Structure formats: structure tokens, C-alpha cells
Amino acid sequence: MGKPVVAIVGRPNVGKSTIFNRIAGERISIVEDTPGVTRDRIYSSAEWLNYDFNLIDTGGIDIGDEPFLAQIRHQAEIAMDEADVIIFMVNGRDGVTSADEEVAKILYRTKKPVVLAVNKLDNPEMRSDVYDFYALGFGEPYPISGTHGLGLGDLLDAVAEHFKNLPDTQYDEQVVQFCLIGRPNVGKSSLVNAMLGEDRVIVSNIAGTTRDAVDTMFAYNQRDFVIVDTAGMRKKGKVYETTEKYSVLRALKAIDRSDVVAVVLDGEEGIIEQDKRIAGYAHEAGKAVVIVVNKWDAVEKDERTMKEFEQNIREHFQFLDYAPVLFMSALTKKRIHTLMPSIITASENHAMRVQTNILNDIIMDAVAMNPTPTHNGQRLKIYYATQVAIKPPSFVVFVNDPELMHFSYERFLENRIRDAFGFEGTPIKIFARARK
């Protein structure tokens, strides 16, 4: 199954971002005292008791200029829809407020587990204030202090207990799972429909792990594939259309469960900043990536247009220089046939293992071609290399001093490895370690 998702829900100014940063282990959100302040980044990976999970700060979801109670209602709705476990946060210094009760009423209706966190109880004398919060009806309240980090261990223990009971959707390892991500209206659903409309494709819908996620399984050229969360692509409704970050949240979950990510761009509108952010999620997750330019039928073009558009993509998506770029139209189905072969190639390269002796021949030839760098009179020495992981392919290069491995030389080695083995569509990782 994908990583569990934990959402932090609560009215403004109860300390959601402070707790988010404490659990995530880094200061990702902007923390201010102004109620309702919005944040740019609302998610992070975290770990507790050997569980990896995604943490969501719903306080970062801006619904716009709506009445206060409508905002927290929307916030709780999104958490209910996407989270596996909800941390309901209140301010222990304020006691139970009507706004807390409003959030609680909404959370009662969800079947998701809720853990109640009473924040801002910064010293032991204040802990007695926690008992008032039993009235909210979520069982034991956990006293915490985001400022000092007190009580977080007990809170996370309670959250992790619920991970054991989560449903698990496992597909056979031979089944390639992929998703289509992109901003609204780039044509993700239309692409799926165009793909599944081919005669060679046999389709069946599989219930996913979230309440309304549906994965679509199909056979292509006698192999099984799963398109992750086809329901998410079709999700409509006012709260979701007005909340860009809702679709980001959904895309994160789909990326996490996929082997290959197809990043869909709108050929008619061109590239915008949101496209780069969405593509960045796939790259950060270490997934294989294919870039799809949809609506190519609507673009006025000459013999240079496609090449210029691809150059523009390469300039904006330098971090995805390994990803193939495909041009197609879901409407006319032109070039749709190129998508599945590219996904298959990216998937196979993502899981590729190379022979150690051939790898080392490549590395030593590279060193002979371009000698290793020196720093303060000391030269980097490379002894040998080995592949340590797949999905994505990861390599350890054993050296005399890892500090001497400049990023530009690491990039040079990556390029030589790519020249030798291909690896189109997948990132590869290289780590320098000292030989013991």
C-alpha cells in the first residue's frame, strides 16, 4: 500500500504549523501568530516507529474569502476525504470553543480515526486543563506543546496504532502501476479514456484504499497495468475546483502508489509554474516519469513548433532531463499509441539492475577520460562502485573521501552510466561513501 496520510485539522491559530514542523523535522511552513495565515507547502514525509507516512497541514489550504465556519468546514471535508488518520488540534489555553465544536461535528461523520491533540500546554501545571476536551467526544485528549516539543511521542504513538488497521491494496509485483498528474483541465481523464478505448485493452475497475479512489486495471499486449486513482481525475465539486491544493494532495497519494508518473501538460496553454511544481513532486519521489503534451491538435504549428516546445520543456524542467516528451491529442487520438510503450520502457528502466563488473568498467573508463577532481591538494580516488537499489536505480561509489566528490563530477559519472545503460524515463541516484 502507499504511505498512510495523516492530516492535522483545527481552527486557525491552534498551532497546526508548529506541530507540522516538529513532526516533519524541518521548518517547512511559515509560522505566524495571525489567525488563518496560509502556507505554500502543506505536505511532508515523516517517520515514526518504522512507519513512513505523509503529513498534511490542512491549515495551508486556502478556500478564499468565505465565512470563517465555512472555511473550517471545507478544511475538515478535505481531511476527511484524503486522510487515513486525522489529528484534531485544539488550543488548550482557550478551552473548548464553538469553532472547535463545529470541527468536531464534521469529524463525527467520518469513519476515519481521529486523535485529539491539546496544544499550547507548555508546563505540567497546565495539564489539568486537558480534561475539558473529553467533551468533544474523541476519547483521550493528548496534551502537547508545539513550542517545546512536549508530548509529541505519546501523540504519534496513538496515531501509529491506527496504521496497523489500514486496508492494503497490493498488486502483483509484475503489475506496472502508473498515474497521470497535472493541473485541472489538461485532459487527464480524456487521455485515460482514449487509452482505454483501444481494442487491445481489457478494462476492470478495482476499489482503492481511500473511500472513493478507484484504480483501473487493464491488459495491454498481454501484460497487466493499473492506472492509479482514476476517480481522483474525475473528482468535481465546488470545494475541490476552488482548492488547487486539494488536487495536489490527491496527486501526491497517486504518485506515492505508482511506479511511473505521466506528467500531463496543456499544449494549447503552454507551461506555467504550477506544472513545474506538480512535476517536482514526481521527481522528489524518485518515480519514473514520462512528459505528455496533450491537446496538440489545437496548436497552430509548422515544422519547428514541436522542437521548440520540447526545448521550452527542457528549459523549464531541467530536473527531468531523463524523461521522454510525447506529443498527442486525446480528442483525435493522434499519437496516443506512443504512451504505453514509453510507460513500459520507463518502468523497465526504473527497475533495471546492471552487472557490477560492467558498471565498474564504465566508471574506470570515465575516470580515464576525465580525471577525478582535487581539493586542497588532495585528489578524489574512486575504488569501485555497486548498485544498491532499484526504483529508482541507486549506486554507491566507494572513494577515499566523500567530501572530495564534487556535484559536477557526480553528474559526469551519472551521464556516463546513462550513456552505457540508457535509463530513459527514470532518475538514478549516486552516493559517495568512504571505503572502510
From Swiss-Prot:
Domain KH-like residue range list: 352-436
Positions with a binding annotation for GTP 2: 182-189, 229-233, 294-297
Family: Belongs to the TRAFAC class TrmE-Era-EngA-EngB-Septin-like GTPase superfamily. EngA (Der) GTPase family.
GO BP terms, alphabetized: ribosome biogenesis
Residues in EngA-type G domain copies: 4-167, 176-351
Function per UniProt: GTPase that plays an essential role in the late steps of ribosome biogenesis.
Subunit composition and interactions: Associates with the 50S ribosomal subunit.
Keywords: GTP-binding, Nucleotide-binding, Repeat, Ribosome biogenesis
Annotated protein name in UniProt: GTPase Der
Binding site for GTP 1: 10-17, 57-61, 119-122
Molecular function (Gene Ontology), one example: GTP binding
